[in-house]
Amino acid sequence: MAQQQQQQLQQQQQHHTSSINNNNSILLLHQQQPQQQQQQQLDQLQQYNNNLYSQNYNMEEYERRKRREREKIERQQGIQIDDRETSLFGEPRRLTEGDAEITAALGEFFEARVYINNQTVGISRSAPGAGNPRLQPNLPPQAKSLGHSPSSASSAAGPTSASATTALPGQQQHYQQQQRPPTYVKQADNKPPYNGRGGYPGQPMKNDIPSSSGMAPPRGPPRSSSSNSNSSSATNNASSGGVPANTPLGPPLSTQMPNGREKSFLGPPAPALHNGTGGGRFVPPAASKRPGVGQQPPPPEKDVNKIISDIANIFSVQPLTSIAATPHAPTRENYNLLAPNKQKYAMDIPSSPPSAEPSSLMTPLFTPIAPLVTTPPQASQLPLGAATSGTILAGEPLAPLHQLPPTPPKAASGVTSPGPTKPLKTEKNHSLEKQDSCLENDLELSESEDEQRKKEGRSAGNSSNSSESDSSESGSESSSKNDLQHHPNHQQHHHQLQQQQQASMQQQQVLQQQQQHRPQPLTSNGAQNKKFRHEIIARGSNTITGLLSSSGFGSGGSVGPAGVNSSAVMGAGSVSGGTLSSGGSSSNKTPSPTESNKWNLSRFFHKPANQTNSESVSPGNVSMKVPGILPGGAQIIPESIDVTTAIVKNEKIHDDHMAMEEGEEEDDDEEQQMRYGGGLSVTPVAVKKEAIDAVSEMALGAIPKTQIKRESAEALLSARLSDSGTSASGSSSSSSSSSDSAVGGEVVPMPGPGETFQLPGVPADITTVVRVPPTQSQKAPPSNSVTLTPILPLPTSPKQRQKKPRKKKAVTSAPILDSSDDDEPPPKHPGLDHSAVSVQAQPATDTVKKGRGRPRKQQQSGGSGNLSSASAGSSSQTKGPTLTAAKKPLAKTPLAMSRARKREHSSQSSSNGNTPTKKVATPVLVAAPLKPTSVTAGSSSSDEDSSSSAESSSKSSSSSSSSDDTETQNTNCRIVKLNKTGAVQKKALLGSGSSSASSSGSEPEDQTSRSQVGSGQALAQQLPPYKQLPISQHSQHLSSSECSSSSGGCTAVCSSSSGEEDEGRREKERERKPKSDKNKISTLTRIFNPKEGGAKKQGQVVIVDLQEEQQQGKLDAAAQPPPPHAPPAAPAAIMAKPRMTPTQQQQLGAGLASPARTTTPHLTSLICKIDLSKLSRERIMRLKKLTPAQQNGHLTPKDQATNAVHVPNGYAGDTNPAAKVKHEHPVKPEPELDAGYEAKFKPGNVKQEFQLKQERDRDRERERERERERERDREREQPPGRRRKRSSSSSSSPYKEKKRKKEKADQLQIGKELLPVPVLLPSNNHERMPNHDRLSYDKLQLLHEDAAAVIGDVSAANGSPTKKLLVMSPLPPPPTVTVAPATCNEAVQTTPPSATTTTATAPPVPATRLIYRSYFDRDVEHPSDDLRKNNQFLQEAINRKHAADLERDSFNQVTLYLEAVVYFLLTADAMERCSSEQATNTMYKDTLSLIKFISTKFRPYQQQSTTNIQHETHNKVAILSLRCQSLISLKLYKLRRKDCRAIINGLTDFFRVGRGDIANGNTPSSISPSNSVGSQGSGSNTPPGRIVSPDIHNMLCKQNEFLSYLNSAHELWDQADRLVRTGNHIDFIRELDHENGPLTLHSTMHEVFRYVQAGLKTLRDAVSHPTHQSQ
């Protein structure tokens, strides 16, 4: 052994990097023995054996000899470890459960198997950070070590535990392996493809050769190792030292550590990989693959021995602590046969900075923190990671984490230097790859075949991807998605091991696990929520921030971990927002149900195309359509889409969205916990656990106590809101606010609507996003406080949390709330839970409000105050289920029964609307709570889901997609709520309206909006005292009806109302009182009654069947407004809600009808087209004024837009009173609808919009004549009610009128000013701007808001001022993108200009408003003449070109080539000024040749159907390529234009003069007289011709060349245009045009560069998060 170790030491010295990394991994694995393993003797080996490495160490002599022989042969042959990587194990080593060595190293396999079977069955990857090596092949070879670092991060718990206990790392590693082991067991038995096991592809026989066999590598570990290391190198550079050891890939430090060959591979392979990488930035996929194969668990025997000996030898040099982080790598490899090699590979990637994202994903619950600390890429996470790592771990895990961070530095110092050369690169890739494969496989429900295929495909594809971009690029992101999802499970398992090893940790996390275990079964049951979770994870993984946002509770980097911790006690998530989430969730998800869920979720995660991004979210972040629901809302998009379908049927909407969430409340909540567990793992635990507060505090250790408290209470709501996946932050905020009040969470003071409140350890951006003024609103008193919890994108997971906390909190906060709240918690609808919490929170804020609110809810029949409070409570609960829930309490059904019934009611909610009407008191509560929920939770529970996801997306860059989807869902929720409200409208409306008004009255700020939600009940009680109540009710109506759908809108209303609240409320009251119940009833009836105006196909408003009943109920409520103030509020609410529903439905119908996704068909209820014409234009304008003012200007409209988006028709006004007063909102949602609902009203669909608009215009023109008369009468009789119709809040319309009259000019000015200053816009735009003047401004603002619609919705709900400010901040950029929606809104708002335009579809105005840069207004690019900079461009181009040459994944290769092309273009552009014309011409020609070569890569895909996502992405790349070719050809022509002119002039003269001899048989040739004899015979046969001089011939040739360039430029451009149309990629191009300015034949090379880079980034995000893309 000693000799062996020495030999290995020598080998390691040769490949010191790999060796050191391996040693570090081993040492880390054996952290228990902190002593430097200078002893190279069996003692150390035994120690390693005792630890996870004992198995490797206790290799039989036969195995050792074989390994030595292998190493000898490799050394002789110069075979690098890379080659040996081919085979994971020198020989397919079978690890029997009774294997003594394995037992010694990993502990009893039975125990491990218990974890694997029970907790990690679906999870093959144990290293969350390690797992997407193929995503990270792009990263430099060093990345391997870093890639390993993420693996270490995932195994961070191991290192941490190692520090604390040697057993812990072993167990952790075992745990991680358990995740893979189940797969390993299966695949070991069933299929070799598992990627590593025996040496299927690369048996002991020369790992080199088998390494490339692709068995495991195809999966991605081998390529991953190389790629992964690159991608994570940056991240792991810091953590490589500690992390690599700590990575699950203990042996994999050398990538193939597990195999006997791996050890030797450590030395040479890394260099080989590095060389193959060609500079290390882009590791060749093949090289990575080989390591991956070699690193597969099967080879651990020899590799382990080698590693052990190397560790003994090398470790003596390096402190044990450095190696301590590697403890569980061997075990992981041994057990995770399917993708253990990935972990191995990942394990050794100490210096893989690019794995910032992968690291997050890979980091285990505990280990992630260390990677955070060590990984620079996760800078945002790092602060939290370091500070929060302990906290996040919920205490005990924290200690190991803290230990781990110190260890990574050592590892970084000792291991990082050597590691980067080879192990870093290889191992990092492996770890990432492993994660990816494991994640994918696990998500695939451990279907070995699918796993193998996915792993192979993924290893090939992802490793390529990873080479393309560091950890966050397309491959890496895609991998990250999986990693996130997988890692949650993996982390869970790992975390569980740690917990078992560490008593206290065990207890805390066991509880979490138990809590999560409960949800996990549900998770498997609820596929929808899983989808959300996966989507969120996918979105989050796009970027670290996105990861944090989507996964981490506090998502934005530092906040992400804190938030995650709050949500989930597990701190591992802290490292990577996603990872933490997944870590926290992992405890919950660890149960077998979770695994199955994860598997399913993984599929859903990948299958649902598109982020967002934005994605990333990735809000996202995704993708990076910031506002798009798909990118940001991608998390929710699956549900959103479902919800959309549900929206079609109000009943179904309630059911699908609400029922999904309520009906599946437990399942969904748990599911979402499980699902988002990957991202929100921690949060779900806290939420799920009744001891959430304690857990939250532990998890939120890094977060301020206030935040933690809030998170605990808020986490429940926030979790649910987050769970919806829509702007987790916004939704979370909303939830948080309620939770805060209810749970007693502290509220952090908020500077102001435009300001960013600062939370300790929380990034400003997150804080801004959170913008929890609405949350504070719930907590009416602290209007300037913000709840930190909302920051979570994790909230997806929090759903579960919310559910349980809701029950707890609801019961605890207010027994009164118990009946409704408990019922609601059972529904587990995020919205409901949130509502319940909201109400509770309000009571917390206002004990009287809450206690009275809920009880009054029960006492609803009581006075208006009771109704109002009940309404507020109901508002909180108001998701479709809320209504049911409210009824349930009346029915006195048990909570369990309530849940079941609620689920049933969710589906029946539409029809049940009548029941609420009958039980007006309870329904009122439901109805009112509905609004509060939306305000508090950003949306209702179902809305919340879509809203949160959409919002995060909105934050990213796919605002339109996200927003659309969110809005659709919101609309669904809204419609359902409205319907329910309608049914319960008598008192529900009163309660909701009055409570809203009260809330507004008590809190003028946006927070009042929340207050209205939560304290709306109390306000309802206060209703009589507050005359502001009308306005407040207006806000509340927005909150209840619209806020459910669009929490942002409600918040905005409140915020807006704050300044104008008194005035608005007074006007509202005046309006409401003047409005007779008759008018309201008639209006509502017209809107909702198919027999009346509503169903005359005027507005295409889809009305649920229940709506009629609800209308009646609303009418009844309007007719029976008990309190003096409440009656007006109730009528306003009634009208608003019914109106809102029609408007929303209209927009849904219109927005969805035009696109393929038409909610109308789904809607079982009538399709009623409501015309804004019904509402007087003046009123609309007034409503705009008032609504925006009360709703924080356009921000609220934007939030409302999400809800009102579906109500583009004139009824936006009517509906808006309850749902959303702002017409802008109806328009805003259109962009969101555009993304979510195929952008019916989006500018992209201008034609559709115009057609719809024309149709609606014709219908509405006819209807408007009638409606105008009616509305005029109503205005005279009931100005407030109708205004309410106009605006979300009925009381806002009078105020708007005043504002319009007083500040018409001011508002225009302010609007203009506000546009630049988005933050100001929300509060003042609508208030100050006159209707028409403000319409234009509103359009722009709406466009901005649309872009930030998702954020706005969530934000508005969470904190109207802050969120709106945040939303508005994005607004200025989005205008171009969201112009169409804004236009639609504007059209709606500009009802006076054209009745038709008043409907949601008002493209004409927006069309004129579409903002494009003028050709003469272009920013003049003054490229630097600095040669150094030009050389930098050239170097970047060359690097990408070489990386693309080595890339194996077709998409990654093509994108890398295209990136190289644009860099070459920048170089050529610079050469135009610095170099000769010929050199420049040559550069362009060469570039054109290169891009033509690239185009050959697209052809196979272009000719195939574009239904395939891969083909679509290739087609989009082809479009960008054709554009580049066209512009290059044009540039080549322009460069020679002077020559061309001279040639043309010369040729013109030549042809004009007719010079030239006629050559024919009769004329001897003067040129060749000697040939005359020979030519005489045939001369007569030659046709007459003209003899031209050589000069003329040359000129003709040159002219042909130059003009061919010109012709090609136009031809290629036309080809691109055709491909855009035939491939249906218009939205993609339009989005790029809006974001980067249109690409034209006049574009400069710098503009081409920006445009193409943006397009490639979007495509990578889409590939990383296919769910976003698909949607």
Swiss-Prot record:
Pfam families: AFF4_CHD (PF18876)
InterPro entries, sorted: AF4/FMR2, AF4/FMR2_CHD
Polar residues composition-biased segments: 588-599, 774-786, 907-917, 1009-1020, 1188-1203
Domain of life of the organism encoding this protein: Eukaryota
Main location: nucleus
Entry's localization field: Nucleus
Chain positions found as Phosphoserine: S446, S448, S819, S820, S869, S871, S1360
Compositionally biased residues, Pro residues: 1120-1130
Composition bias, Basic and acidic residues: 70-79, 424-437, 1063-1080, 1224-1241, 1250-1280
Protein name from the UniProt record: AF4/FMR2 family member lilli
